[in-house]
Amino acid sequence: MSPFAPFDAQTQVLLIDDDPHLRQALRQTLDLAGLKVATLDDARQLDTAQCKDWPGVVVSDIRMPGIDGMELLRQLHEQDADLPVILITGHGDVPLAVQAMRGGAYDFLEKPFPSDALLDSVRRALEVRRLVLENRTLRLALAERHELHGRLIGRSAGMQRLREQVGSLAAIQADVLVLGETGAGKEVVARALHDLSSRRDGPFVAINAGALAESVVESELFGHEAGAFTGAQKRRIGKFEYANGGTLFLDEIESMSLDVQVKLLRLLQERVVERLGSNQLIPLDIRIIAATKEDLRQAADQGRFRADLYYRLNVASLRIPPLRERGEDIPLLFRHFAEAGAMRHGLTPRELDAGQSARLLAYDWPGNVRELQNAAERFALGLGLSLDDGVLPDAADEPHNLSAKVEAFERSLIAAELERPHNSLRSVAEALGIPRKTLHDKLRKHGLPFNTPGENPPDDGE
């Protein structure tokens, strides 16, 4: 017996009863009331896994062969605990119906019952269902909004606009072009678009076209058959095919050769992929999110990028503002990354003083969020407020030479270990992997007191 799935948006009432005369009479009543009805004579035909978020009502007899109304109620509520189920009982089945109500049934009707009683119960159940699903939608929207705030951090107008755009584009299936400088967070945006979409349970495949050698880029993206070229000893599934059913994030798309761009354009238009060495077209159900740090329009004008591919990609685009355009977000982001870094290493979070905060805002951040994250994590480790290109201006309290940096790092590690729960110098020394006397010498050198009741300095011979 093949499963029957009437759980579509058009069906309002699913009626299940093994008595053909009663089933026909009840259907006629519901039809005349303008309700869209589907009927079954056996609950075993039903695919209950499809009922989640269905906007309708189930009306079922309790006494049926195979799966009775009580078992059906249990199976439906395993999938959606709020689905309204109205049970029909015969004379003498009232105790069973009361048990069903306690088990989550919406209502029960004792035979014989007037048509108005059925219609009234169904209409009330439909209204309750509408409100439940509306509430679910609102809660989901709030949860997604909260998740977006956690991923795309910032109070600036640019970030607020970006979050709104991501939320809107996540709900549709269109391919997206993400524009942003190096380190701006293009993959973070792409991942958010995937995770908030209907494809969230499918694969998310990220590939950087700029990191692929010209000789392997086509094989990596489109795949190949055994013998397609020298060295192709077995079939390879390409990234596009691997991402089928999900999302493929293609970064640095501007680095692709014109020949590969032609193949990508065909894939975007026809939604098929052809492995190297094969004539078979493989259908794809895929969303492509491309990203670039360049002006593709200018690249197209210069002949470095296909104009038709640019126009095909630029239907839906997002621009991530560089960090220098959203200075108000810098302290917030720095604190977020510094606290995360401290937590990861088991350290107590450090606080920026006013001077350090001012230096953060004065810096241009050419590496954007990636550079800021690196600086914040170094700060969390006690390595000072420095960048890849050197110490920030006015950071006179930070070490400049290698020896001083090593000393500062050693001090930060010991200080961090001292903040952990220890009851003796010996346990601290063991945690650091050094003798207790060495630890005592370093505590004295770095000015780090450690006072434990009964703890005495080690003897020279220890």
Curated annotation (Swiss-Prot):
One of its GO terms (cellular component) is protein-DNA complex. Residues 152-381 form the Sigma-54 factor interaction domain. InterPro entries: AAA+_ATPase, CheY-like_superfamily, Homeodomain-like_sf, HTH_Fis, HTH_TyrR, P-loop_NTPase, Sig_transdc_resp-reg_receiver, Sigma_54_int. GO terms for biological process: phosphorelay signal transduction system; positive regulation of DNA-templated transcription; positive regulation of organic acid transport. Residues 12-126 form the Response regulatory domain. The modification 4-aspartylphosphate is found at D61. ATP binds at residues 180-187, 243-252. PROSITE patterns: RESPONSE_REGULATORY, SIGMA54_INTERACT_1, SIGMA54_INTERACT_2, SIGMA54_INTERACT_3, SIGMA54_INTERACT_4. SUPFAM superfamilies: CheY-like, Homeodomain-like, P-loop containing nucleoside triphosphate hydrolases. Phosphorylated by DctB. GO terms for molecular function: ATP binding; ATP hydrolysis activity; cis-regulatory region sequence-specific DNA binding; DNA-binding transcription activator activity. Keywords: Activator, ATP-binding, DNA-binding, Nucleotide-binding, Phosphoprotein, Transcription, Transcription regulation, Two-component regulatory system. PANTHER family: C4-DICARBOXYLATE TRANSPORT TRANSCRIPTIONAL REGULATORY PROTEIN DCTD, TRANSCRIPTIONAL REGULATORY PROTEIN. Member of the two-component regulatory system DctB/DctD, which regulates C4-dicarboxylate transport via regulation of expression of the dctPQM operon and dctA. This is C4-dicarboxylate transport transcriptional regulatory protein DctD. It comes from Pseudomonas aeruginosa (strain ATCC 15692 / DSM 22644 / CIP 104116 / JCM 14847 / LMG 12228 / 1C / PRS 101 / PAO1). The lineage of its organism: Bacteria, Pseudomonadati, Pseudomonadota, Gammaproteobacteria, Pseudomonadales.
